[in-house]
């Protein structure tokens, strides 16, 4: 860690821009509103880039100011998701989420502000992005919802920005989008030396250049060879989970037969019906017959009851008669409590490529998405969204494609039918209606190995370690530093 000498770091050399309490609250509200726009189910990509500026301005001056700024910003940040959280997880868990979000931003803001008093600008500006990235990593590791709710998804409309996820996952995206605002905010709060400002500008410029070159290279690396035709089919005609197979299949089967391409894939949604073991066997037969008739691989999701045990499953039927089942690994708390989770990924070698099978919530979890890295080149994902989160559900899956270098075909009830290439570019996307929604796309059967796919969250864990070490170090060092001349002056005054 770079630590300058005490003489360089005196608070006398760094006059602090101070605001009154009302102005600090207003700045905190502005920062929170920008963060809220980034956390929203339909986010504004530009908002998180600006949020650190008012946040760090409000935090400057004292520890109390930093805690106030972080608390106000964190409380406002969660407001865009409150109605969604209340409907999805209820009051008690929503309150816990709010408290954790507020506490996270208080911690990150306080640590960033304290670092400005002890570190050069080029180092201090890394603290807020790195700390928030560390918190995001810990969240996705311990939360049953994985990386759902991450600020990283705000950038899914800025496809060049999210390419850094192929290097460091969600934490890398968070770090990148908060970095320029952190520089701007700290730049304005103190009277930094000219050399400090130049060093900080050079560092941010180099990081921005590196990220840009990497994104340009990745987005322009075109896969060669043939493609795999994909058909995505879904309808919102049925309410909930139908209790029988025949009526559901009578509606889906004509669309499958009419639209499937020989040698291609057909992906249907999650939970088409709730079936007992015998019904699941009949469903497998019907889907297998459709696969043989069309020459396409057909994937469909059903919930299966075996005596007193329930499973959320995906069925893959191949033209050669193979039938493969996959059990969903990550279940939605409060909505799928009766289901028993699976514990392993499933790969299928077919149509000249290697498929990976996942179901909806699985792809909200980077760890599960990474199980398929370097193995699958195309992910098939039956899904069932909540309607209002259709865009976000699709984009969370899309980011797994960027992280791991595979293409994705996703078909969701109450959501979108969509396909993405290995860089996360949208190939096709359409909202599902009560009518039968059918779209087609062509996916490359060739994946692209990524650093994140091989090494996982190394960057995120580095952020965690550095944030902890910095917090411990700051707790052991007195504040503020006094130069030796100031110490002498203090001793003379004491005499």
Language-model segments: residues:
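Membrane-embedded alpha-helical bundles of multi-pass enzymes
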Residues: 2-219, 387, 420-423, 427, ...
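Non-cytosolic juxtamembrane linkers/loops
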Residues: 206-260, 389-392, 399-400, 409, ...
